[in-house]
């Protein structure tokens, strides 16, 4: 089932609010999801002035362009073609696929990102494959239950936050925060 909106996804919204609190930039590059105007309004409410949205499905892009109510940078193509190291930019990569189908995406983006994955492959497999693909070793992990359930992973190359959640299906976000 393809979602047409995330307005009723309370857990997704809580995770998004929590993770984006770690990024204080004015630019965002992302995948807008099913409702581009909802996404842009949310970005603007968080202070993002420079918004670049990528879409690689022609029908979805056409629908987004027909309903678009805000001036933004709209790119047709694979987000792998996006510049991956823009200064003062967060990358919002809401893939909704399993980790093992996104190896190129996981290795491309180095810093300041939030990646959303399906947990169909399981939590442990997702975590293990993510860091294996990035060629990083987990040095320390700290589990916290507040303000939402999350794990802070410190690796040999940085710091990440992992947040599992479930609205209609089991999902997770992994954010590179340092």
Specify the residue positions occupied by each region the protein language model found.
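S-adenosyl-L-methionine
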Residues: 1-46, 54-88
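Short, flexible/disordered intra-domain loops and linkers
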Residues: 3-6, 124-134
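A short acidic (Asp/Glu
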Residues: 17, 36-44, 62-67, 84-86, ...
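A conserved beta-strand element that flanks and buttresses the S-adenosyl-L-methionine
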Residues: 92
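A short, conserved alpha-helix within the catalytic core of class I
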Residues: 97-111
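Conserved beta-strand signature within the Rossmann-like core of class I S-adenosyl-L-methionine
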Residues: 111-125
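Class I S-adenosyl-L-methionine
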Residues: 128-178
